[in-house]
């Protein structure tokens, strides 16, 4: 009976979510965010395994669905459902089930539907669905199946999993702004196949996920990336924040967690300023099992992933005794569900039980300097073992253990309230060019009544509907490692709605305010432009990064040659520039430009072949192992948008289109319907920015260095959508661009009032290399301050004004750059000076322009473009935040 009702409930939910265009929203009500998603709650002691949305059975129940229209029928003993077009018909004689409908639009915005029984409930108001069901265990073994249905927004999601080596396959599709750019296989005749193999071994991944697109630049990458030398010896953590987590290679095995902020270290101070800060990883808590000992090491498997996290299990070799966990950005608890294992919660510190007055709840002191709460459910009892460092169940345990650090004694009441709602994953849904949702997959009996407790980052709070802030006296506030204070939010719907409004600065190929005719004449821009176009051009750097810089440099000259304020109505210079650029580009179109691009099959991506020919993961800045693709390909995308805007009917434009769409798919594919590239390789909608580091392990986690090159990619994506008449790509690029700018202003470019980073680090004004666990005032290639700051300025572009406000530029210039020898000693041979002077022009144009006319140019910059952009920004410019992106 229970199984039948749940199947019908899932069928109802599937019928409804097959309709297109959910409109999800959040309301603030008693610190509860209310919005729209679908939950699959389960009792906290039960394991969560998914079941395919498609279902057939013999006996008393039958279901059918076909096509993309909301047409569906389901019938069973006492329950029937049918939908056709926009009509919904429900009837039920089951004494434990009830159904109601109102309105006539099952797929639109006005109708409502609810269904409930003793084991499930489903409701839909307008376009907002919500589903919950108690799970069941088909057998007493770990290989049993349980029903797990979730869907959100306009996407459809199905998950299937089982114990052992089978992987969860998650498929989600969405039209609108998250429609795939393309789905066809990259032609092998154009892109030869290659595989990283032993160059970058993959570990801890279920076999069912191998050979399919795998994310490469995510916070959890350290959990699946290794080197041949470290293959069986070293485990590196990942930073979900506020916790760091690890799958250890040595005892204690299991899910190891650390509250990083407790272990912060600053470098030695110079004039009161720190060069870096970082955090140790310490075994605060490991969710383990006594069976994981000696030779009985667990086998770790990541068997599913979402936009914001992964699902992992640790099993004995028999694959019948396992612990299962989901590791997700912002998770408030570290959670593990045990199946017939003797649970052991272990620490590096001596444990003391402070309070066990509530059954299934233990408050423990660790080493006298931190307090954690442990929830074990009502099954079994736990005691501290003889070592004094482990809280162990008295017998084999099937249930869920959840732990969290207590920032205050009052926090335990909040944790108590939300302890039975678990986060299992999360995905982004985009509703418009100004609004997106972070949708959390939730499991637990209290998700709809009390809600999900989940941590938000500082850049979320100003734009999160109904946000709980640190000013709320009941708020739980913990610290991330490098992104400041995190405030726990509550949602009964599993969805956060965030907005990025249109801004004040027009985003286009040209600066908002072009240089006046008088300024053009004063600077001699026409003569300078003619000289730059007549100069020797080449794409012969044998690097996708350096060649890309050259390409965008030359394309920018063609933009200037189309500006009537410089050239008047004469098209000759523009035609010369375009002809030269197009001739230069021809080897790129057939992938004969050195080094040729390969399609890499281990992860699914477009990579430089140089790493394979040289057998060097660092070749071409690590492009072959997925480093920096957004930097490298951003130049190609942006420059190609410039070319297409100026010469859309170029005879080889179709070939250029094909190459650029492949690059866009590699970096920013928005849909899992594309079977050849992972979703959003670099960009995180939770973090608001990209990660540059690829598939080799890093002790301090993923990192990002050049924020301006990050911005350049999404700027180019927006422009490419614009010139291609693809509104969805233009709008998605616009949203990502504005979100990226917000995150960069919050975390990377520090004005004096910045509270994200330690006060001793803020005077540096830029973070340098920004890791998950460390911020280092440095670059990968130079310790010079002009390089540390200059790498945040390239390429020179009108879009930089969106990120680099005049307030920031003034402080950076006054406090640091104006005092550097490269500036004070009138050094005109160091090419970095050209970048610093274009930047200075935003606050002191009169000083910068004369120097810029003589300065040696950066290799990605021409004097024409430098002067043109410097002349377009003046001290009168306010802290600019673009109006249309």
What positions do the PLM features span?
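Inter-helical turn/loop segments and adjacent helix faces that build the functional surface
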Residues: 561-568, 643-655, 717-731
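N-terminal, immediately post-signal peptide pro-regions of secreted/luminal proteins
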Residues: 22-108, 112-134, 141-154
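Cleavable N-terminal signal peptides of Sec/SRP-targeted secreted and luminal proteins
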Residues: 5-21
């Amino acid at each position: 009976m229970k199984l039948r009702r749940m199947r019908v409930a899932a069928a109802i939910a599937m019928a409804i979510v097959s309709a297109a265009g959910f409109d999800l929203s959040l309301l603030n009500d008693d610190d509860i965010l209310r919005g729209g998603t679908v939950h699959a709650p389960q009792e906290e002691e039960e394991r969560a395994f998914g079941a395919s949305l498609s279902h057939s059975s013999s006996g008393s129940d039958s279901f059918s669905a076909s096509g993309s229209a909301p047409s569906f029928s389901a019938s069973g003993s006492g329950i029937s459902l049918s939908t056709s077009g926009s009509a919904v018909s429900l009837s039920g004689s089951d004494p434990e089930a009830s159904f109601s409908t109102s309105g006539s639009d099952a797929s639109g915005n006005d109708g409502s539907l609810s269904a409930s029984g003793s084991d499930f409930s489903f409701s839909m108001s307008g376009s907002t669905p919500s589903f919950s069901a108690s799970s069941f265990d088909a057998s007493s073994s770990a290989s049993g199946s349980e029903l797990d249905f979730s869907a959100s927004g306009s996407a459809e999601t199905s998950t299937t999993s089982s114990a052992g080596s089978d992987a969860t396959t998650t498929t989600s599709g969405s039209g609108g702004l998250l429609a795939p750019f393309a789905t066809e296989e990259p032609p092998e005749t154009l892109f030869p196949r290659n595989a990283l193999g032993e160059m970058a071994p993959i570990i801890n991944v279920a076999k069912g996920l191998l050979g399919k697109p795998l994310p490469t630049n995510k916070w959890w990458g350290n959990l699946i990336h290794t080197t041949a030398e470290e293959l069986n010896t070293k485990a590196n953590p990942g930073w979900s924040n506020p916790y760091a987590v690890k799958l250890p290679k040595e005892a204690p095995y299991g899910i190891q967690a650390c509250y990083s902020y407790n272990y912060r270290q600053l470098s030695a101070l110079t004039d009161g300023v720190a060069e870096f800060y970082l955090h140790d990883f310490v075994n605060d808590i490991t969710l383990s099992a006594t069976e994981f000992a000696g030779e009985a090491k667990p086998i770790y498997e990541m068997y599913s992933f979402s936009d914001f996290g992964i699902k992992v299990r640790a099993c004995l070799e028999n694959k019948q005794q396992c612990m299962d966990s989901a590791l997700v950005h912002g998770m408030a608890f570290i959670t593990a569900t045990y199946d017939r294992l003797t649970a052991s919660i272990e620490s590096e510190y001596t444990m003391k039980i402070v309070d066990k007055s509530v059954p299934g709840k233990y408050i423990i002191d660790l080493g006298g300097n931190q307090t954690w709460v442990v929830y074990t459910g009502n099954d079994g009892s736990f005691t501290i073992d003889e070592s004094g460092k482990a809280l162990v169940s008295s017998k084999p345990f099937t249930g869920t253990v959840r732990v969290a650090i207590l920032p205050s004694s009052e926090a335990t009441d909040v944790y108590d309230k939300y302890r039975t709602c678990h986060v299992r994953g999360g995905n982004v849904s985009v509703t418009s060019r100004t609004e997106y949702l972070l949708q959390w997959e939730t499991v637990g009996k209290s998700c709809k009544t009390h809600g999900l407790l989940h941590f938000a980052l500082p850049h979320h709070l100003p734009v999160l509907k109904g946000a709980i802030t640190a000013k709320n006296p009941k708020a739980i506030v913990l610290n991330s490692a490098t992104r400041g204070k995190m405030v726990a939010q509550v949602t009964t719907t599993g969805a956060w709605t965030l907005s990025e409004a249109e801004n004040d600065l027009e985003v286009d190929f040209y600066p908002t305010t072009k240089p006046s005719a008088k300024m053009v004449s004063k600077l001699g821009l026409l003569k300078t432009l003619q000289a730059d176009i007549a100069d020797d051009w080449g794409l012969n750097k044998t690097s996708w990064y350096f060649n890309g810089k050259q390409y965008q440099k030359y394309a920018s000259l063609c933009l200037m040659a189309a500006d009537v304020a410089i050239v008047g109505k004469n098209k000759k210079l523009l035609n010369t520039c375009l002809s030269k650029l197009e001739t230069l580009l021809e080897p790129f179109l057939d992938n004969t430009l050195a080094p040729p691009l390969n399609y890499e099959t281990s992860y699914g991506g477009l990579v430089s072949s140089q790493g394979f020919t040289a057998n060097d993961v660092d070749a071409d800045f690590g492009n072959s192992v997925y480093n920096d693709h957004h930097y490298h390909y951003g130049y190609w995308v942006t420059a190609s948008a410039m070319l297409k805007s100026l010469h859309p009917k170029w005879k080889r434009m179709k070939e250029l289109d094909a190459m650029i769409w492949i690059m866009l798919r590699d970096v920013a594919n928005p849909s899992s319907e594309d079977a050849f590239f992972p979703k959003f390789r670099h960009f995180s909608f939770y973090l608001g920015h990209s990660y540059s580091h690829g598939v080799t392990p890093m002790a301090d986690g993923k990192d990002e260095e050049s924020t301006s090159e990050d911005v350049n990619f999404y700027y180019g994506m927006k422009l490419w959508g614009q010139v291609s008449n693809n509104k969805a790509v233009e709008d998605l690029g616009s949203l990502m661009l504005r979100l990226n700018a917000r995150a960069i202003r919050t975390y990377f470019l520090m004005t004096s009032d910045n509270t994200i980073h330690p006060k001793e680090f803020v005077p540096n004004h830029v973070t340098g290399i920004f890791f998950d666990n460390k911020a280092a005032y440095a670059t990968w290639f130079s310790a010079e301050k002009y390089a540390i700051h200059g790498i945040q300025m390239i390429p020179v572009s009108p879009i930089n004004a969106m990120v680099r406000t005049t307030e920031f530029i003034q402080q950076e210039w006054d406090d640091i750059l104006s005092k550097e020898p490269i500036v004070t000693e009138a050094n005109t041979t160091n090419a970095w000076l050209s970048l610093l002077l274009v930047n200075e022009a935003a606050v002191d144009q009169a000083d910068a322009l004369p120097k810029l006319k003589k300065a040696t140019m950066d290799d990605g910059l021409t004097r024409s473009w430098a002067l043109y952009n410097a002349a377009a920004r003046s001290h009168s410019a306010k802290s600019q935040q673009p109006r249309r992106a």
